[in-house]
Amino acid sequence: MANYRVLVSDPISEKGVEALAAAPGISVDVKTGISFDAKTGKPTEEFLKLIPEYHGLVVRSETKVTAEVFAAAKNLKIIGRAGVGVDNIDRSAATDHGVIVMNTPTGNTISTAEHAFTLMLATARNIGPAHAEVLKGNFKAARKAYQGIELNGKRLAVIGMGRIGTEFAKRAQSFNMHVVAYDPFLSQARADQLKVEL
């Protein structure tokens, strides 16, 4: 028999649900789309009646965990935010009710850096416009007008050298780009370590 019940109130990966369910002493219920009424901007009555049964809550962005939710959640011990920000969780109310709030700050770091780098590469090589011309059958126009530029040897400015900016800079350096960084919190020693110019 499970000692702790966890409610997953927003869609998350099936693998995440399976990992929770596999943990000893935990039962997991997935009930998405019931937590928040976008018209009223408040938690639904259904959610407020349901939440007292649970010890844990897993959310993404849809569920708004307000002071009203915490007041109803008599057994809640922990909230896991499957994502970076916790702006949809009233952290002051969480503290008042002794509920731990956790997030996954590095969950999308690599994906975001890769996506941004892919967009830069596609822009430099004119992938979008060239593809559109090829679909129209204009092969010669695509070849001449959309040759693009090489990233090799170019200077790249990165604004913000947090987790994502750092990963983005690493990808640029692998293309032999010279990275110039702006970040008021980045020390010269850390910039040297990352091989970026301040």
Describe the residue ranges of each PLM region.
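Rossmann-like dinucleotide/phosphate-binding beta-alpha-beta segment
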Residues: 144-198
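Phosphate-coordination loops involved in phosphoryl transfer and adenosine-cofactor binding
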Residues: 3, 76, 152-155
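N-terminal glycine-/charge-rich "phosphate-binding" loop or analogous flexible N-terminal tail
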Residues: 1-54
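Short gly/ser/thr-rich secondary-structure transition/capping motifs
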Residues: 29-41, 60-61, 136-144, 193-198
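Acidic, amphipathic alpha-helical patches
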Residues: 44-47, 66, 147, 195-196
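Short loop/helix-cap segments at secondary-structure boundaries that form the rim of catalytic
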Residues: 16-22, 71, 89-96, 186-194
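Short, polar loop motifs at secondary-structure junctions
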Residues: 11-14, 62, 183-188
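Phosphate/diphosphate ligand-binding glycine-rich loop within oxidoreductases
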Residues: 7, 35, 40, 55-135, ...
